[in-house]
Regions:
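Intracellular juxtamembrane helix-capping segments at the cytosolic ends
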Residues: 110-124, 217, 299-315
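Central cavity-lining transmembrane alpha-helices of secondary-active solute carriers
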Residues: 44-62, 234-249
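Cytoplasmic helix-loop-helix junction between adjacent transmembrane helices
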Residues: 104-140
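Hydrophobic core of transmembrane alpha-helices in multi-pass small-molecule transporters
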Residues: 15, 94-112, 204, 285-301
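C-terminal ends and interior cores of transmembrane alpha-helices
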Residues: 78-92, 268-282
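Helix-loop boundary and gating motifs at the non-cytosolic
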Residues: 1-51, 194-237
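Symmetry-related core transmembrane helices of the 12-TM Major Facilitator Superfamily/SLC fold
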Residues: 161-179, 352-370
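Helix-to-loop junctions at the C-terminal end of transmembrane segments
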Residues: 56-69, 155, 245-259
């Protein structure tokens, strides 16, 4: 894959983690609905999860400082695996089970994702970042094409088996990570918020989009197919396959020096995704067409965003602090999306119209990305943009 063995190991780890997520975790919102929560109630539960992540973040940072990045990452991996048995227990008739799931996911996420992003940012290579993220995305997409199909069938026939399989695979994902040479990261000094501002703003837009637009689309798909796990999982798998090519193509485009151009290409693609999903969300056939066609375009999104984020983290004074603060921004954006979506659904606004809220967020994100990519090439000659080296 790459000359960098640590990136290869992290890609395998990410693939196994995504396989575990696809077997059970990807269905979390659907499980909450089947457990008896209303759509608005499920969004409030997700918002509570993000709120808890936000307030427990200092404790996670203390763990990283005290135990080190490698140990904290291993703890995060175990906690990530532990969320699936708790999800199996959720029942709206027993509110404590939902509270337990919210707590389990919040603690797992706040430790795992801060560590994972910091490790990937520090271990990766700036000159190959886009391609490395693109390949990682393809590895994860391969997992996403299989796991939701299998997970949907298991949840339909023997629900406990899906959660057990996800737990085992998540624990196996620890094995490739143990071979990664985790870079030393100095986190004792507080550098203030300024060096990390780009990450916070970019992740806030991503949190808003993922918790609003992406989850709402999942709700539409699940409801369209009468809340059947098997049909929902099959559609998720087929849609994931359609998104693989975009990630690879755009990752190479970024590495070739066309990052700024890729930003606007991604904005156009994501705008088309939003409009396509809104237009076709009324019928099962339309939902299938929109899911397959739009996910192919959605494959451009992750490399465009995360190349900028990881490169900013690597050049920041501290990659751990960068992602600690950036993840907090993600939580704030996600909470805003969850509260707004829950209120709109409770007021009777059709879910398909709520997808349009993604459009202004995408514009803001594109502006931030464009500024970030241009700022990352301060020594480029005046004519570089016309020559195609930074645009």
């Amino acid at each position: 894959m790459f000359r960098n063995p640590d990136i290869n190991r992290l890609a395998v780890h990410a693939g196994l983690r995504q396989l575990a997520w696809g077997l059970a975790g990807i269905f979390f919102f659907a499980v909450l609905l089947r457990a008896g929560l209303s759509p608005a109630g499920a969004f409030l539960a997700l918002g509570a999860m993000l709120g808890l992540r936000l307030v427990t973040r200092p404790a996670a940072f203390a763990l990283i400082r005290g135990a080190g990045l490698r140990t904290a990452m291993l703890v995060g991996c175990v906690l990530f695996a532990g969320q699936f048995p708790v999800l199996a227990l959720v029942d709206a008739g027993r509110p404590w089970t939902i509270a337990a799931y919210v707590l389990a996911v919040a603690i797992a996420d706040v430790v795992y994702w801060t560590c994972y992003h910091a490790v990937f940012a520090a271990a990766g290579d700036v000159g190959e970042r886009g391609a490395q993220i693109g390949v990682r995305t393809v590895v994860m997409v391969l997992a996403d094409t299989v796991a939701p199909v299998v997970g949907g069938l298991l949840l339909t026939w023997h629900g406990w088996a899906a959660f057990a399989a996800a737990t085992v695979v998540a624990l196996i994902a620890i094995v490739p990570f143990r071979g990664v040479s985790v870079p030393d990261v100095v986190i004792a000094e507080d550098h203030g918020p300024a060096p990390f501002r780009d990450g916070v703003r970019l992740f806030a837009t991503d949190g808003f989009l993922m918790c609003g637009f992406a989850v709402t689309w999942g709700l539409i798909m699940f409801e369209t197919f009468d809340r059947r796990f098997d049909a929902f999982g099959g559609l998720l798998g087929a849609a994931a396959l359609a998104g693989a090519v975009g990630g690879l193509v755009l990752g190479r485009l970024i590495d070739a020096g066309h990052a700024a151009r890729a930003v606007w290409l991604n904005l156009a693609a994501m705008t088309a995704v939003v409009l396509l999903r809104v237009a076709l969300a009324d019928t099962p056939t339309g939902v299938v067409v929109a899911a397959l066609a739009s996910t192919a375009l959605f494959g451009l999104y992750v490399p465009t965003l995360m190349t900028a984020v990881y490169n900013a983290a690597k050049t920041s004074p501290c990659a751990v602090r960068f992602h600690y603060r950036a993840e907090a921004g993600w939580d704030v954006g996600g909470i805003a999306a969850c509260l707004a979506t829950a209120a709109a659904l409770a007021a009777g606004v059709p879910a398909r119209l709520l997808l349009l809220a993604a459009l202004p967020a995408l514009v803001v994100q594109a502006i931030l990305l464009h500024r970030r990519y241009l700022a990352a090439t301060p020594d480029a000659p005046t004519g570089a943009a016309l020559a195609g080296r930074i645009d």
